Each structure stands twice: as structure tokens, then as C-alpha cells.
Amino acid sequence: MKKIALLAFAVLVFASMSFAKTITGTVSDAHCGAKHATPSDAAAHCVEHCVSGGSTYVLVSNGKVYQLDSQDKFKGLGGKSVTVKGSVKGDSITVASVAEKTS
């Protein structure tokens, strides 16, 4: 009986890790990271410049920098506040959707 209970608990823990989560933050780049935690025109210009130079988009939320798997979904969103839905594992997000946050 204990083995069944332990197995059921393990299944619940792993299942909860794969559910989609919603995170709001600012799109930055891997080079600058949390330097662009606040949305601005200057941040947008810098992020897009760094990405065009080979850096990748990241999401900064509550001081944490998340790596993003779907880079093409973030084109034109550098330096802007967004809401990302996806699966979070450590500091990486498997992105299901992204939308620019208004106000």
C-alpha cells in the first residue's frame, strides 16, 4: 500500500511540473539580462540590437532571467512587457504563447 501511495504522489508531482504557467515580465536579451527589467524604448532598441548581433531573447520576471525556446515568437517585443504561457523547468520556459501586456 505504501508503494502505491508513493507512486501516486510521484505521478502528481511530475504531472504538476508539466502544466502551463503564466509569467509576466519584460523581454530582454541574454547579453544584458536583468539590465532591461523595466520596459522602455531604450531597452527595446538595445535588446533588438543585441539580438540582431547574435544574442537570444530572455524573459525577466521578478528579478529572475528565463531562457526562452521559441525565439521567433519574441521578434519585435524586445524591451516590452509581455505575458508568457508555457511550461517552466528551472530557468527555462517552453513557450506556448506570448502576448504584449497592455497597461
Residue map of PLM features:
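Mature soluble domains of exported/periplasmic/lumenal proteins and thiol-rich metal-chelating peptides
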Residues: 21-103
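Classic N-terminal secretory signal peptides
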Residues: 2-19
